[in-house]
Regions:
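Short glycine-/polar-rich loops that comprise or flank the Walker A/P-loop
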Residues: 2, 84-89, 116-120, 149-152, ...
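Pre-Walker A-like glycine/lysine-rich segment at the N-terminus of P-loop NTPase domains
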Residues: 2-53, 178
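Beta-strand secondary-structure signal
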Residues: 5-7, 88-92, 105-107
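Conserved P-loop NTP-binding catalytic core
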Residues: 31-34, 45-102
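Short, solvent-exposed secondary-structure capping/transition elements
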Residues: 56-57, 99-103, 116, 186-192
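Glycine-rich phosphate-binding loops of NTPases
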Residues: 61-72, 99-153, 163-177
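Extended, Lys/Glu-rich alpha-helical coiled-coil stalks
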Residues: 158-206
Length: 206
């Protein structure tokens, strides 16, 4: 998987359309994003994660009132005063399976309604919009190849990477990301469940 393009529209300090072409090759495959404090580096990374994973990035299993409250502070402040202004993040991905190269565009958009914000999420494959079922399948596939915890190994900012690795939860973060990447998180959960079952069985026999 390769990220080719990122587009931010009215998110944080980004006003109107901002396009980042980060298409790389084998010789030049690391992209550095620089800027002064407050220029929008953290917003840039947070927007990419939100586009790919949605509310899960913000700690929610499904979009709800609290999620949209946080998103209201994430989008550009102009949306508070003009109901016609929208905000979105769009990410273009390239997948090469060895036989064919496919291009996916993920578009996550927020717009105002009377009670706050509403979200719209679209996925296009090679220029054609996917239906709801195909979009869910692709989102699940994306979660399987790069879980949100693993995202920090590929996209990180200098202010948070030290906390991710060296903070109080650093070891757990690394362990969880590794298990999810290799599909071992289910096995680990099974081992823990068996251990608890054996412990209960031992206690009941006593």
């Amino acid at each position: 998987m390769k990220i080719r393009r990122i587009e931010l529209f009215n998110l944080g300090p980004y006003i109107d359309k901002n396009i980042f072409d980060i298409n790389c090759n084998r010789e030049r495959h690391i992209v550095l994003i620089g800027g002064k404090n407050g220029a929008g580096k953290t917003t840039f990374f947070k927007a990419i994660k939100t586009c790919l994973y949605g509310c899960k990035v913000w700690g929610f299993e499904a979009p709800g009132k609290e999620y949209f409250r946080q998103m209201a502070s994430f989008v550009n402040s102009r949306m508070q005063f003009d109901s016609h202004i929208k905000a979105y993040v769009e990410v273009e991905l390239e997948f090469d399976d060895g036989k064919q190269i496919n291009y996916f565009v993920l578009h996550r958009e927020w717009y105002r309604i009377k009670k706050g914000l509403e979200e719209k999420f679209l996925i296009c494959k090679n220029g054609c919009e996917l239906d709801r079922e195909s979009s869910i399948d692709f989102s699940n596939y994306l979660l399987s190849i790069i879980p949100p915890d693993m995202f920090n190994f590929y996209f990180f900012d200098g202010e948070s990477i030290a906390d991710f690795f060296l903070g109080s939860d650093g070891s757990r973060n690394f362990r969880n990301a590794f298990l999810k990447l290799y599909g071992l998180d289910t096995l680990s959960l099974m081992v823990e469940n068996f251990a608890r079952a054996l412990k209960r069985s031992g206690n009941s026999s006593n």
